[in-house]
Amino acid sequence: MQVRNARGQLGNGYAHDAKTSSFNKFFDLFAVQWILLCNFAIDIASAELPFGYANRAVSHGGPVWMRIVEQLKLTKMYEHIVLNEPHASMEGLYDAEKSFWNIDADFLNNVVIKWTDWHTDYLFHGLQDSRIRTVRFPYSRFIVDAERLWNDPMESIGQGIVYKEFEDYRRDIPSDLEQHLLNLWHWHQDRLRQALQEGALLLDCHSFPDDLSDVDICIGYNEDWSKPSDDIIDMAVNHFMDRGYKVGVNYPYSNSETPDCDFGYHSLMLEVNKKTYLKPGSILLQDDGLRDDITAFQQRLLMGS
């Protein structure tokens, strides 16, 4: 598998309004009853077949009984979740060997404060569970963008792994120190690989400025081997719609982080609009409403919750 489809591109997906979810509520109740009735089949299937076999069995045909059992198996969700938090920090901006930005009030107010994923390392940590692991990048994205691709297309405008330009600001980095910064990207990718395992879900944790879109919650994924099942994506959309959020699918951002691994796992991005949890014109938290909703979502993602 190759590293591909990193988050960070504006998406061309679609948005759901909470008003359209009444039918989904009825369907969810029916689905829960169906899952309970078929629990025995799920247990039998999970004991013998490896992660990813379900999608292969369905897409390539196979015996009818296998297709039915494998589809049931998908309802078991995940045994492990890895939280990827690459943009939650401001560290390094005043480090003489890492920053190289001409920092002034405008840069902090209009660039750093706007594009830092404030408090995502708090919002996604409401559920204390040994099955959830966190990989938080400890430096600002304006030091190293740990989620860019190697040879990312954004490099052409000075916003690859190591930003050289951002809006009207420029950054001149000595070549030897730039290599040190690139090593931080490798370090973050290695930590993600070590945290992941067969069949896990990587949950890509982000926020975005409220002037970018009126969408409250953006759910993103890749159209490749890392895409969760349609059932899981639908569950994610309905979970937040039923709580009154306007949900975008691969909009306004698309894709999700996929570090190179030699085993199968899924990746799902969750972007939250800053207006849903920050006080207007501030980086102060409103309350724990969104955090509680994310916690409930994580509980649904975990097997047996």
List each language-model region with its residue ranges.
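N-terminal catalytic or cofactor-binding beta/alpha core of small enzyme domains
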Residues: 65-202, 207-305
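N-terminal amphipathic/hydrophobic targeting modules at extreme N-termini
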Residues: 48-51, 57-64
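Short, positively charged and aromatic/hydrophobic N-terminal segments
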Residues: 29, 35, 39-42, 50, ...
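Hydrophobic, low-acid, alpha-helix-prone terminal segments
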Residues: 4-7, 11, 23-30, 40, ...
